[in-house]
UniProtKB/Swiss-Prot annotation:
The name this protein goes by in its record: Fanconi anemia core complex-associated protein 20
Subcellular localization(s) per the UniProt record: Nucleus; Chromosome
Record organism: Mus musculus
Pfam families xref list: FANCA_interact, UBZ_FAAP20
Location of region: Disordered: 1-30, 50-90
Length: 186
């Protein structure tokens, strides 16, 4: 009989543990404790499909921090929320914390030296926020456009007017590439 079961490939149910009672293997979010209760409520409302995200619903209590985040300072207390209006609605937004300063800064990836020519990245020379070390807002910095990287189309050799925007140049290049059947080395 045992060999017959193996040949058919049937699975058998596991035997209960030797303790005699049901095993105590509750998921972590159902275990007793004040830290896990908000997570359990969030999970229950999501899994059951009864999550009601309308403004009239009582909000869930704040979720506890993960152990790796407990030692970090609270970013909400250091950065005030900003408000912006779209149409007739006003939204609040908490900006991201400022980037860490030091050798790992990625600012050098986007800013070319002042003397570099042909850089497609706009220069932010006139931005006082970057000089002071804080995050600039959209109103503070107006990018200064660098000269065009291409003076003429490499496909049709048409000279680009200096008054053309980068979008116009890109549009022309895309049109020429779409019509071209030859390989071009840039």
């Amino acid at each position: 009989m045992e060999e017959e079961r193996r040949l058919r490939g049937r699975l058998s149910r596991r035997r209960p543990p030797a303790g005699g009672g049901p095993p105590n293997c509750r998921p972590w979010f159902l275990s007793e404790g004040s830290k896990s209760e908000p997570w359990a409520a969030l999970l229950r409302s999501t899994v059951s499909g009864t999550a009601d995200w309308t403004p009239n619903r009582q909000p869930l209590p704040p979720l506890p921090a993960f152990p790796s985040q407990e030692s970090l300072p609270d970013p909400e207390s250091t950065v005030p929320p900003e408000a912006f209006t779209v149409g007739s609605k006003t939204f609040s937004w908490t900006p991201l914390p400022p980037a860490l300063r030091g050798s790992g800064s990625s600012r050098h990836l986007f800013c070319e030296p002042e003397g570099s020519l042909g850089s497609p990245t706009p220069s932010l020379k006139g931005c006082p926020a970057l000089n002071s070390g804080r995050t600039p807002s959209a109103q503070e910095c107006v990018p200064v456009q660098s000269p065009l990287a291409l003076l003429s189309c490499p496909l049709c050799q048409k000279a680009f007017d200096p008054k053309l925007t980068q979008l116009d140049v890109d549009s022309h290049l895309a049109q020429c590439l779409a019509e071209c059947t030859e390989d071009v080395v840039w």
